[in-house]
Amino acid sequence: MGSKNRYFPLAINLFLHYTCIVIKRTGYADLPLHVGTVPKWLADRMMELGTLIVESLIINYGKKEVLQRLSDPLWFQSLGAVLGMDWHSSGITTSVMYALKRGINRRAKEFGLCVCGGRGKYSRKTPEELLFLADATGLDGENLVRTSKLTAKVDSTAIQDGFQLYQHNFILSDEGDWAVVQQGMNGQTQTARRYHWCSESVKNFCEDPHTAVIGENRGKILNLTAKEASPTKNAIIQISKENPDKIIKECKQIIDTNSFSKSSLKNATELELFENPESEKTKILLYNDRNLTMPSHHEVRAEDVDLKRLGAVLATAYSTPTDNFEDLLLTQGLGPRTLQTLTLVSEVIYGTPSRFYDPARFSFANGGKDGHPFPVPLKVYDNAIQVLQDSIEKSKLGYKDKSECIKRLHTTALEIEKNCSPEADFEKTLAFERANSDAWGGKTV
């Protein structure tokens, strides 16, 4: 009983039927906990641009790609930044998912996608919404509801990391593929952790089931979904079958002899206790490839951005020969600053996973509602929406010149990165943005 007793308090809560469903958590993100609301002038634009990005992904790659991208913490954070939301706070999760739910659901039949759930009371409506969708599509509603509840149960119970879930979004395709984006908060540390799940990328529900997670370094955490924790899970299940009086007696002995000490935990090999390593290059902490921890500071700093990549974006917008993007530049009112935004939007659509390790860079598309790195340039934002919308509509009719131009913005930036040394002067770039903020319709909350 010795090694089992230390885990007794978890026994009841962890009696879950893990292996019945094949799903995986793709990762997590840790974020500073912020309060406040997104103003209507930004929320509506986030909905428009976010929906257009989703539509572009569906046209180019299919709806499964949308689910896979939403299950990537780094891509999700970059999407929120390019939409003009505060680049690193907990609010990016709520605002992006609200924008996508508004935009995608009104075109659910066309897209073959629907967003369920939300924050607080809306998260509790997820089962009802899933059953409704199941009736409309012929999918197994009870299985979907069970999956939704299990993903929430794992992140709220099986992983003892101190975060209480308050948001749960279940994104479902009409073919039964899905992604989950949910978030918990820790009031004591004023941090939030966003968890990502995806049905496509998993082998076993209870062994490393997450595709990724985003959050602040909280030191040691208990992860009972890792493969290495199998002996621990088995011990817990066995403990749950023992006589309660016997277990209580043994627990008392453990407490009296101080067996449940920090030193014994440090040497325990049966459960995964790990310390999140700090990055030497940037204050954004990256580990397990797609997991992300955002820094506590509010302002965007040079260390948060890949300056070479930012330099390539600026060079694409301001220094590339105009005949490269002639079809775009014929759009009335479109100039280099809108090209800058469109280049970053293009990267969100066409970029590979390795492009999203510095989400802060994408805030140089449309700024941030709190003025970081600069106020949201509404005129530029609206121009970018119009150009992207026009390119999509024309591509549906067979006229792909504009959509090809938008794709070429990203490929041009890649070529500049490869063949030049376009490192941006961070302070001068910020000064330029702020000096022109009024002319571009800059606005903050």
Segments from the language model and where they lie:
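N-terminal amphipathic/basic-hydrophobic helices that include classical n-h-c signal peptides
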Residues: 1-21
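Structure-specific DNA junction-binding interface
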Residues: 14-292, 433-445
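Short acidic (Asp/Glu) and glycine-rich catalytic loops that position anionic groups and cofactors
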Residues: 54-59, 290-293, 321-322, 362-368
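Intrinsically disordered or highly flexible coil/loop and linker segments, enriched in small
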Residues: 88, 260, 323, 340, ...
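Helix-hairpin-helix/helix-loop-helix acidic hairpins
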Residues: 296-325
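Helix-hairpin-helix
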Residues: 303-309, 325-344
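Phosphate-backbone recognition surface of nucleic-acid-processing proteins
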Residues: 336, 340-396
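Low-complexity, acidic/Ser/Thr- and charged residue-rich accessory regions of DNA metabolism proteins
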Residues: 373-377, 395-445
